[in-house]
Design a protein with these regions (language model features):
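Acidic/glycine-rich phosphate/pyrophosphate-binding loops and surrounding catalytic core
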Residues: 1-200, 204-211, 215, 227-232, ...
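A generic signature of intrinsically disordered, low-complexity regions enriched in glycine/proline
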Residues: 171, 223-224, 281
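Short secondary-structure boundary segments
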Residues: 220, 246, 267-268
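Short acidic, glycine/proline-enriched helix-loop-strand junctions
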Residues: 235-241, 284-286
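Ligand-binding grooves and catalytic loops that recognize ribose/phosphate and carbohydrate rings
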Residues: 248, 256-263, 282-285
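Short, charged, intrinsically disordered terminal tails
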Residues: 268-286
Length: 286
């Protein structure tokens, strides 16, 4: 299935789930007879943000039958005070959808904004910023789509596509007597699109290159060691990709990029989200 179709299906699923969390009736809006009023509202950015989540907000708007028009596209940088979009419909429906739409936009835009900061920081290098699987449960596609809108690249979405042999898998190999080379070969036989191996020592790096790993994951090392290990890996296995992760922040990410990382994966893009500051205002007299 194409990625765009995956996003559309996920948006419809998440919109239904999020609205269901608020129950079948909005007692407050019913009490003030909000459904009798046709209203217009606007979504504002209270601080600079990279907009994301529009497809998901659209899915909510369709379910509650309000009209949502965007003043900017997904992935656009919105200045503080900028109008993101407008809504028209009966006030009861707008109020019912308000928090759901904002929750989706604020989380997605928060992810896109921090991702864009990382991408901008490594600009001019050959390095790509990646997400990890450290996403909120049930929000994998949503979170990853937001990373993309911020300029990040696609990593593995699940355990079925790319094999990644990490420290605990190394421990399993040691216990069952299987060699790394055999594990890499078996992963390919099982249909792995690629095989990535985490290395923590120079000896593991040598073994991973000999086993035919497509990419090496270098975790919690210094930029200097990354440079040394990366150069050695490319001597042993020309074309092998180098991914850095662990202990990387906006303050030091460029050092890792300049040290030769092809990819840098950052868990904080999705596991420590700071929501974008967005608000929905009902226009007076509407």
């Amino acid at each position: 299935m194409e990625w765009t179709s995956v996003i559309e299906q996920d948006a419809a699923r998440l919109a239904r789930l999020a609205l269901a969390e608020d129950g079948e009736r909005d007692l407050t809006s019913l009490a003030v007879h909000a459904g009798r009023i046709t209203a217009q509202g606007r979504i504002e950015a209270r601080s600079e943000t990279v907009l994301a989540g529009c497809r998901y907000a659209d899915a909510v708007a369709r379910l509650v039958k309000i009209k949502l028009e965007w003043m900017a596209d997904d992935g656009r940088r919105i200045p503080a005070g900028g109008i993101v979009g407008t809504l028209v419909g009966d006030l009861g429906s707008i109020l019912r959808a308000e928090r759901t739409i904002l929750n989706l936009l604020q989380r997605a835009s928060g992810i896109a904004t921090i991702t864009r900061q990382y991408v901008d920081t490594v600009e001019g290098t050959a390095c790509t910023i990646l997400h990890t699987r450290k996403t909120a449960p049930g929000l994998r596609v949503f979170d990853v789509h937001a990373v993309q809108l911020g300029g990040g690249g696609l990593h593995r979405l699940d355990l079925a596509g790319i094999a990644m042999i990490k420290d605990n898998h190394w421990a399993a190999l040691a216990r069952n007597g299987t060699s790394l080379a055999d594990a890499v070969q078996e992963a390919r036989r099982l249909g792995a699109q690629a095989v990535q191996v985490e290395v923590e020592t120079a000896e593991q790096l040598k073994l991973a290159c000999a086993a035919g790993a497509d990419r090496l994951l270098i975790d919690n090392q210094t930029p200097e060691r990354l440079r040394t290990w990366g150069a050695r890996a490319r001597e042993l296995r020309p074309g092998v990709e180098i991914e850095a992760t662990g202990g990387i922040s906006l303050k030091n990410v460029r050092r890792f990029a300049e040290a030769g990382a092809d990819f840098i994966s950052v868990g904080a893009l999705t596991h420590s989200v700071v929501a974008a500051d967005l608000a929905l205002e009902i226009e007076p007299g509407s």
